[in-house]
Amino acid sequence: KSLLNKLNGVVYKMRDKGVGLFPLIMQVVHNNYTGGITKIRFRHDEQRLFIDFLEGQETHTIGMGFLRPEITHIDMNGEDYLTSVLGRFGTNEDGVIVLTLQIAYIEEATERQLKIYFPDKDHIELHWDEIPGNTMITDTLEMITMGSGNLSPFVDKLMENIPLNLLKRNITGTIQPAVKADRMTGEDADTGFVTSTAGIVG
């Protein structure tokens, strides 16, 4: 409860703005690409924690259930997606507080996973992952690079000259990025956010 009170209304600004709430595999399949999260804000009431993600000009608000998943509609570039959000607080081996979120896209059979580390009051670090994710994509990549015979000569030649380990590292960095954020103060902190819980079903 003490941590929630301290977080209430706090805004953090992303150092890297290339990561979005939408899973990478869904961005590709739906041709619906993220604008990248620029700021994140925490709010809470007596029962729930809310997290506002400012992505482009849009505010995506998720309600987080601790005992049961919270159902939330997310509008991504005009397309509606139903999510189930479950969260829990814990600590890592160094005693750092960690908020773990599981954001399941119910109708898509995909899940966005987020761990938010709170090393101190002025900084957070967000570690992203998704399911299906790194393992499936890297396994597919390995099959391709081993030579399928279905590649165009240009792609085949290109794959021959790019080390597989380098490709895997780049893919891992894209699917499982770690982004640092700094606490904002002053009147500009809330600029851009639209405060609403209309998309939260409960």
What residue ranges belong to the model's regions?
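Peripheral terminal and inter-domain segments
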Residues: 1-202
